[in-house]
Amino acid sequence: MEFKHISVLLDECIEGLNIKENGIYVDCTLGGAGHSSEILKNLSKEGKLIGIDQDEEALKAASEKLKEYENVLYKHSNFYHIKDILEELEVGKVDGILMDLGVSSYQLDEKSRGFSYMQNAPLDMRMNKKSSLDAYEVVNFYDESKLARIIKDYGEERFAKRISNFIVESRENKKIETTGELVDIIKRAIPAKFRREGPHPAKRTFQAIRIEVNGELEILNKAIEDSVKSLKSGGRIAIITFHSLEDRIVKNKFKELEDPCICPKDFPICTCGKEPLVKIITRKPIDPSKEEVEINPRSRSAKLRIAEKL
């Protein structure tokens, strides 16, 4: 199996991580190992890379791609568990951590995974195939109000109520089994005028269901906090996001870690004792260049934010 994936903001990530040749680095979303491969090129044999992915197929493909390197440790897990993983591996503090929060090109293109609204496939969307919750469960068994909330909150979809209503009405006759069936329902729910404008009409709903299935936003907050605690002083964390919800979480969490003081604004001095943990390197997120977007259109919505441990 070939795990096809074009790494997004590759040069910007490598530069942003400020790699030390003998350092220890963690790729929390190993995927096609594009970023990891570049990190390893910048490491000596004393340096080390830890690659984490919850997708076993991604791990297998990455280990094949990186087989010439002996300084790589692979871990089948979710980066939610980064603190436990590093304790288990007894590596202590690390010099850099990377998170690429996008669905890989392989996962989008592999029909059986059910991530794409462009191909007909079973409703799945699990990053980790061993997870019990899948898209079929969400679409067919969540009640209408819960579905509407997920589509509105996670997909930022203005027609969330109509879409959830159409889904519930459709499944009363027959369970919704494929991505193609779901796309047709979404298209019927969205007024024609709005279907013709902007991105694919199913994009936001599919994003929302994927986030729910994989618990992506709940995981992210804790993972950033634990990652920063796992960094050495001067170590950096670089995070690539692909939609505004994720970017907002990263932006706000970095701000909170840079200025954690909870004292009232009119207090002359801080008495809460909460000290800054990071310095934000990217006041504004780094976007892909026009050239990168032309080569890889999927990079269009990517944003990179970087912070350094104090």
Curated annotation (Swiss-Prot):
Pfam families: Methyltransf_5. Its EC number is 2.1.1.199. Its main location: cytoplasm. Keywords: Cytoplasm, Methyltransferase, rRNA processing, S-adenosyl-L-methionine, Transferase. Specifically methylates the N4 position of cytidine in position 1402 (C1402) of 16S rRNA. One of its GO terms (biological process) is rRNA base methylation. It comes from Clostridium tetani (strain Massachusetts / E88). It catalyses: cytidine(1402) in 16S rRNA + S-adenosyl-L-methionine = N(4)-methylcytidine(1402) in 16S rRNA + S-adenosyl-L-homocysteine + H(+). Belongs to the methyltransferase superfamily. RsmH family. S-adenosyl-L-methionine binds at residues 33-35, 53, 79, 100, 107. One of its GO terms (molecular function) is rRNA (cytosine-N4-)-methyltransferase activity. This is Ribosomal RNA small subunit methyltransferase H. GO terms for cellular component: cytoplasm. It is found in: Cytoplasm.
